[in-house]
A protein has these predicted regions:
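N-terminal presequence-like segments and the immediate start of the first folded domain
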Residues: 1-60, 64-77, 83-142
Length: 142
């Protein structure tokens, strides 16, 4: 499956300051997958103490879900991420930026009060889109 999205060209606003797009266009007729929020819980029920380790597990879980639908991280069009403190923003962003440098999706990062278990410091949910034929390169719509 081919990714069904492309960044929306934008002018007149500050450029993204990390690996994300201000806007992402999804092709008509694309198949969508909505992933529930993934926590840093390993298959062996362990939780790394650090945000970066938890983010790696979150994205590995997302990758497994997308593979079940015949997709990959390259198909992600939107990320909503939640961390429990400002100190977790940079470690989360390092993982996200490394994984999405080539195909930066639209992305939001929020600081929240906590999750279902105190040891969780990051939760990630995504939307992915795919079509059999990729979007043609064309001028943006007015």
């Amino acid at each position: 499956m081919k990714p069904a999205h492309r960044p929306v060209p934008v002018s007149g606003i500050a450029p993204p300051f990390a690996a994300y797009s201000h806007g992402v266009e999804v092709a008509p007729g694309a198949r969508l997958v909505f992933c529930s929020g993934q926590l840093g819980l390993g298959a062996d029920d362990t939780v790394p103490a650090d945000c970066e380790g938890q983010a790696e597990i979150c994205f590995a879980n997302v990758k497994a879900i997308l593979e079940g639908a015949g997709m990959s991280l390259a198909h992600v069009v939107r990320i909503n991420a939640y961390v429990t403190g400002r100190e977790h923003m940079a470690p989360y962003m390092r993982v996200r930026d490394r994984l999405f440098a080539e195909h930066p999706p639209a992305s939001t990062l929020m600081i929240v009060g906590g999750f279902t278990r105190a040891e969780f410091v990051v939760e990630i949910e995504v939307v992915a889109a795919a079509i059999e034929t990729p979007l043609a390169e064309e001028e943006p719509r007015s």
